[in-house]
Amino acid sequence: MATLPTTRRAVMAGAALLPFLRMPQARAKTPGVLTFGLSSYPPTIQPWANSGTAAATIKLMIYRGLTSYGADGKLQPELAESWTRETDTSWVFKLRDAKFQNGEKVTSADVKWTFEQIAGERSTAYFRAEVQGFERVETPDDLTVRIVTKQPVVTLPVWMASYHLPIISRNSPRGQFVGAGPFVLKGQERGVSLDLEPFEGYYKPGLPKLRGIRVVAYADENLRTAALQSGDVDLIEYVPWQAMDAITANPELSLDAVDGAFMFLVFNGSKPPFNDARVRKAVAHAINRDDLVKAAFFGRGSGLAHLPIPESSAFYNADFKNAWNYDPALAKKLLAEAGHGGGINCSLLSTAQYGMHKDTAEVVQQHLAAVGINVTLNLPDWATRVAVGNRGQYDMAVMGTAADSNDPDGLASFIDGALSPSYVRSFGLKTERITQLLAAGRAEFDEAKRRAIYREMEQVAITEAPMVGLTWRSQGYAMRKAVTGFRNLPGALTFYSGLTFETAAVG
């Protein structure tokens, strides 16, 4: 099946290559200030909200949590210098000597206050449901925090590394959020750029190395790439897949790409027709993922016909690899069984701001049409797409991201319908058995037993299809050779790479 018109793909590839014909002299810059080309202007940088990965990158410059990740992807101490498990439901975190950007010390009272805000009755925090699972937060002294959970949570230290769980000063001015990260937001031109300066009181000696970061939003991926080539920016995220070969061949630039991000579909399960698992499975079997990899990612990826658990994971189940295989005849059969033999008309939410989202939506539209599902595309800007998704104003939606961590509990964000509504997961779609198994998995400390639990969970998810995997994709940053110390973190942690701005430098 044709995926994108040949002429369009040729134009896209040509546009990607044109900027690399030569490297003109870069404009004058302030020494030590890195200019970063962001893929979109963040809808919000509220610390506990999930508004996309562009916002997450800025949050990782400004805020820090109790734990985080090193450049090797391993969990490491952050505001907490150590942590221990006292009992199955009790964890103790020892805080380091650190300051917030208002000059005040980070204390256990700030940690407790942060969790109280997240769990509040009117909170819209991404981790609200998880933090509401805390029985209590104790503060034996200024540098000791004891978190007592209602149920065992083996992954609690991993939760604390999330860029959605930074610790904020309890003395932050109303409507503001004072963090303890390496950079301070000093100015912004809404929709265009943000300027950050180093926090002189940062708790890591000698860091950050940069004298500042200027963040410029380039919604157009070709303009973002051209800005790197011309020297207007030093580093860009979301390198277009059609430009990766040209960047690799350019001696003035370097590409840092990893596999770990993925594309998938979510559904509005609060109403017909996608409240029926048979219809969702029909969608899963209607899509040729090889076509999708070629069309949207220029071959830099692979099909994903199961839950996004990578082969490198101890929790990977090889026999589920092709669970949602391309089988249009089966898709039609499932639709007929669900009472939709005459076809379905529905909408598909995506965004035109990211080429991969738009291209994915177009290919999915073509494949679904072949089995009788007629799709109308809705392609707003990213901020609108997030808002519409959060409100459930769609039938199906294209999503692309990475898991919250390399632990399978990180999949809860995408398939646990008991969590607060979010654009990253299906709307109004609750599968009680999945919620139960996810809870059992995070409560089990024996790894062999955890593997058995997550195997059953994946089997249920394949049957119920609360999300439909589409493709793994390569996720890249590109930079001038003068940039050092910035790393693309491995696997699912690629969107935590903003942590390494603290060690980045530019010549």
Tell me the role of every PLM-derived stretch.
Residues A370-R385, A412-K481, A505-G507:
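Extracytoplasmic/peripheral linker and loop segments enriched in polar/acidic and small residues
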Residues M479-G507:
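Long beta-strand-rich cores associated with HINT superfamily self-processing modules
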Residues G201-A246, N374-T376:
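Ligand-site clamp/hinge motif
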Residues G37-T87, E116, V178-G179:
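N-terminal lobe/hinge region of extracytoplasmic solute-binding protein
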Residues K74, V153-R214, D220-N222, P328-A329, ...:
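Gly/Pro-rich hinge or "lid" segments in bacterial periplasmic/extracellular proteins
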Residues T84, F127-R170:
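Surface-exposed binding/hinge segments that line
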Residues E81-T124, R146, A227, P273:
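Aromatic- and charge-enriched surface segment that lines or borders ligand/interaction sites
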Residues G303-E337, Y354-K358:
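Structural transition elements
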